[in-house]
């Protein structure tokens, strides 16, 4: 495990530059789905009992990206390598999670709170920690509970399937979960509740969300209330992206310093507008009297 990056103003500025570059890359390559998958698969190996795995950039090594569940993920790793060379200060772990956050946002999804400072690691976990699409509810709970996540997290994060499609050469399955696989919305849950979604994919793990009564409550909620889905998804995605990671205090200090500055600028602008309105009203009244 490498040393944690120093998250200072310079690092945060580099993160914002990388964020802009990621928006452009994802828009030009239409690669939001695989960027979200990369972020998920790097983080989703976490084991809270042993404190191993998690969002540490180890997925960039052959011993991990060659796992069966990661078939095709090298495409995203290769797309991001020039970005890493352009922004060398940022760790792979931070870059991969930032790519996932941006992928959701640029496709119409919620804004996800992102705090940098993750360490890079070359220690890859053993194969088999990611969900197996051919299994059901008990398996999903086993995998997500191992990470320290909840039933709500399971369903909310499954909503990420609103982006992208399964490919037979990668998973053995073929097709998209929604009619617009490049738009982040709640249509995944709407389609899940339909008895027949012609031409759309429903994996055994997807069907488990409807068959399990606890999971189904969240599916029904998210299908009828996209705002609720976006709120819960943003919360669950943040939890996933920070598994085993304690954000550095410096990042919070930086963010807190930015908010008052922004608020001050907004307040100053508001005062200036109000003063202009008062001055204009006074001028109009004076003109009336002179007339």
From Swiss-Prot:
The keyword Transmembrane applies. InterPro entries: Ccp1-like, Haem_peroxidase, Haem_peroxidase_sf, Peroxidase_I, Peroxidases_AS, Peroxidases_heam-ligand_BS. K(+) binds at residues 162, 178, 185. PROSITE patterns: PEROXIDASE_1, PEROXIDASE_2, PEROXIDASE_4. One of its GO terms (cellular component) is peroxisomal membrane. It is an enzyme of class 1 (oxidoreductase). Residues 114-133 are annotated as: Disordered. Its cofactor is heme b. Its EC number is 1.11.1.11. It is found in: Peroxisome membrane. Keywords: Calcium, Heme, Hydrogen peroxide, Iron, Membrane, Metal-binding, Oxidoreductase, Peroxidase, Peroxisome, Potassium, Transmembrane, Transmembrane helix. Its main location: membrane. Pfam families: peroxidase. One of its GO terms (biological process) is hydrogen peroxide catabolic process. Residues 116-133 have a biased composition (Basic and acidic residues). It is a single-pass membrane protein. Plays a key role in hydrogen peroxide removal. Belongs to the peroxidase family. Ascorbate peroxidase subfamily. This is Probable L-ascorbate peroxidase 3, peroxisomal. It comes from Oryza sativa subsp. japonica (Rice). The gene is APX3.
